[in-house]
């Protein structure tokens, strides 16, 4: 048994356990994630965020989902990560370069009365290239009709840090759990996150997400961004959009430099594990 100091955080309800591991003490992070994220026998979370040293940026973020699978990027997670490393004095500036599995991302903190009240992340530039998403298709998947099981969907698929598939329809047309079938479809060799999206007007959309490796979540930052990108490419929305999600709202703006996402990051509590065994 060993003690592990951590913080429990959330970004619009998408919740994480974050801890420092500068000495690379925890080799089997998949097992650690499964133990910590278990809502009955652990702490409970959608995933873990591990703070490590970086040779290419100020700090490195490793993301592992509740099921033990690695994620290259997580929009809500990186906002929480940026707040944590600033609050803990691990970085000094309000502009932070963070190494992720999807390259170096830039975070900008909004400070009010010495507190972080919001974080903006440059999420990068999406790609629709089928081989990179990846999705089995000769052409880009943009508003394309497909059959999965007995159901037909009109989908758009892209890579924005991680694979995303967007279905634009009235938000209550499909239960979010239907995302499990789409995630596991053989047209997505690495699986996909699934976003059900409804356009409210040119400046506002509503999104609910089935997250690969985590299931239904209250918020998905990359999914919100991907949904705005899909709607914008189909000329359904403007370049700056409010995204309503079950856990709150985010603001996403498409710029020449990348997709900018702004949203909250909240530290719920800090603690220390006492009787959890991470040796497996």
PLM region spans:
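Zinc-dependent deaminase
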Residues: 128, 140-142
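Short, charged/polar, Gly/Pro-enriched secondary-structure boundary elements
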Residues: 127-131, 270
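A glycine-rich beta-to-alpha transition motif near the start of alpha/beta enzyme domains, typified by
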Residues: 1-115, 165-280
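Membrane helix-loop-helix hairpins that form the core translocation module of multi-pass transporters
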Residues: 100, 118-126
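Beta-strand scaffold of nucleotide-dependent catalytic cores
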Residues: 121, 156, 220
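Internal active-site segments that recognize and position negatively charged phosphoryl groups
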Residues: 142-172
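Glycine-rich beta-alpha junction loops
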Residues: 125-127, 160-164, 265
């Amino acid at each position: 048994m060993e003690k592990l100091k951590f913080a429990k955080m959330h970004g619009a309800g998408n919740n994480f356990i974050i801890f420092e591991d500068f000495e690379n003490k925890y080799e089997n992070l998949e097992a650690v994630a499964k133990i910590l994220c278990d809502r009955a026998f652990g702490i409970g979370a959608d995933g873990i965020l591990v703070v490590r040293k970086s040779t290419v940026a100020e700090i490195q973020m490793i993301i592992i989902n509740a099921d033990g699978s690695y994620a290259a990027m997580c929009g809500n997670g990186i906002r929480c990560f940026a707040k944590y490393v600033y609050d803990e004095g691990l970085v000094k500036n309000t502009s932070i370069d963070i190494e992720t599995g999807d390259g170096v991302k830039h975070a900008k903190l909004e400070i009010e009365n010495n507190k972080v009240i919001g974080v903006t992340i440059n999420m990068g530039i999406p790609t629709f290239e089928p081989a990179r998403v990846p999705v089995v298709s000769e052409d880009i998947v943009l508003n394309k009709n497909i059959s999965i099981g007995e159901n037909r969907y009109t989908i758009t698929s892209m890579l924005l840090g991680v694979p995303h598939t967007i279905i634009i329809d009235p938000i209550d047309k499909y239960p979010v759990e239907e995302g499990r079938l789409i995630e596991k479809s053989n047209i997505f060799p690495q699986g996909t996150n699934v976003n059900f999206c409804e356009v409210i007007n040119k400046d506002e959309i509503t999104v609910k997400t089935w997250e690969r490796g985590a299931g239904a979540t209250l918020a998905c930052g990359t999914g919100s961004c991907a949904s705005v990108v899909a709607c914008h490419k189909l000329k359904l929305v403007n370049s700056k959009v409010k995204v309503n999600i079950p856990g709150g709202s985010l603001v996403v703006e498409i710029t020449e430099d990348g997709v900018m996402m702004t949203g909250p990051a909240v530290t719920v509590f800090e603690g220390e594990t006492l009787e959890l065994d991470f040796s497996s």
